[in-house]
């Protein structure tokens, strides 16, 4: 999935203030899937979401789409070291259920996010988080892009899903 130079410049303009934030940079410290950091995973989801919206003319708000995709896993902990499943009562404390809430709290703490961005972050794990349903097209796009990226990253341990030529600091 290739984005044009113009599309990459658009993403850079939208996400510059978020990408430069020290807390966002901490996502580089944590592994998400395979050997892919949480930071790179979020970038992959941004690129795939943006590509889907542009190529299929889905009409999503590109700013909300990019910001929500970039912050959807802004949870800032190593989920591999969290306690494992130990009975039904601990089920909803597991990473898959709990991390959208952590990402939402961190995004609210660091940035003034919109209602669409809130919905994108809190519902990106749907249907696992069945009470948090995507209510806007941007959230549906990110939900699908996240699953696509997660499968590729987990199965193939690829650090670049959307574009194998993209540098770490490029969109």
Question: Where does each model-flagged region fall?
Answer:
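Metal-dependent phosphohydrolase cores
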Residues: 1-171
């Amino acid at each position: 999935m290739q984005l044009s130079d113009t599309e990459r410049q658009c993403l850079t303009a939208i996400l510059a203030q978020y990408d430069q934030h020290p807390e966002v940079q901490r996502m580089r410290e944590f592994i998400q899937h395979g050997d892919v950091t949480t930071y790179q995973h979020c970038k992959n989801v941004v690129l795939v979401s943006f590509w889907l919206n542009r190529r299929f003319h889905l009409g999503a708000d590109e700013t909300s789409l990019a910001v929500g995709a970039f912050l959807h896993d802004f949870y800032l902990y190593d989920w591999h070291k969290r306690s494992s499943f130990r009975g039904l009562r601990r089920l909803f404390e597991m990473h898959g259920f709990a991390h959208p809430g952590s990402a939402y709290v961190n995004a609210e703490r660091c940035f003034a996010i919109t209602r669409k961005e809130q919905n994108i972050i809190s519902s990106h794990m749907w249907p696992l988080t069945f009470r948090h349903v995507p209510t806007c097209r941007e959230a549906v796009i990110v939900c699908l892009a996240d699953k696509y990226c997660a499968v590729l990253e987990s199965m193939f341990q690829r650090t670049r899903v959307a574009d194998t030529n993209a540098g770490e600091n490029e969109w």
